Amino acid sequence: MLLRPLRGWAALALRCFEPGSPGSPASGPGSRRVQRGAWPSDKEREKEKKSVICVEGNIASGKTTCLEFFSNATDIEVLTEPVSKWRNVRGHNPLGLMYQDASRWGLTLQTYVQLTMLDRHTCPQVSSVRLMERSIHSARYIFVENLYRSGKMPEVDYVVLSEWFDWILRNMDVSIDLIVYLRTNPETCYQRLKRRCREEEKVIPLEYLEAIHHLHEEWLIKGSLFPVAAPVLVIEADHHMERMLQLFEQNRDRILTPENRKLGP
């Protein structure tokens, strides 16, 4: 069911970079192969004073609470993860299928996740600040990586997804300006997950959350997994709701004000 829309999307993307097509790179010696076409460049974004902030963290780390806290701020747009799409692709639920049998459905889900997150990154930005729940970067560096490391994704699937991801990085603007990492103990996430009782999450074991936490630490804290796409602001997120809201308020300027983002990973 996913192949037809993906073929159409791929054909459209590739046509954008054919010589002679609108937005295609110039041909000839010394010409650059990569051109971002309709998507704004980093310099254009800086000129327009628009920024993209991604809230990253484990399952049940408090990302939704963070997004809701800042959603009423002036001139900010919030993009949540397109979970409803992952639960219903023309009547199919690839998210639920993946949690039931990751070896069989991991590639199916992550291919669609990569597509839908690309759509999130490249849709027109109307506000000065865009706050996103996760990113195409964590989809690849955390969740695809976990499937592969755990032996639930064959190497050929991993390589194909990685090739798609690398092509996207080279040819499209999925850059971000700040990562807010809600650093949460896996046990805390597990208890929250059980309390909120989402259908697909009922089968998630603590070991899975521990693996996801470990990859976040490698990527965003140690910097030993993959390149970090932006400066990282770490917020310890094991606290109760009232304390988390206080921490969000304390970090408001560091999150929303561009000149306060020179944080480093």
UniProtKB/Swiss-Prot annotation:
Cite the entry's keywords alphabetically. ATP-binding, DNA synthesis, Kinase, Mitochondrion, Nucleotide-binding, Transferase, Transit peptide
Q: What's one Pfam family here?
A: dNK
CDD domains recorded for this chain?
A: dNK (cd01673)
Subunit-level organization: Homodimer.
Q: Where is this region: Disordered?
A: 21-45
What enzyme category does the UniProt record give?
Answer: transferase
This chain belongs to which protein, by name? Answer: Thymidine kinase 2, mitochondrial
A GO term, aspect molecular function: ATP binding
Q: Which residues form the active site?
A: E133 (proton acceptor)
- Which ranges does the record mark as transmembrane? none
Q: In the UniProt record, which is one GO cellular component term?
A: mitochondrion
Q: Name one GO biological process term.
A: DNA biosynthetic process
- Positions with a binding annotation for ATP: G57, N58, I59, A60, S61, G62, K63, T64, T65
| EC numbers | 2.7.1.21, 2.7.1.74, 2.7.1.-
What Gene3D superfamilies does UniProt report for this protein, alphabetically? Answer: P-loop containing nucleotide triphosphate hydrolases
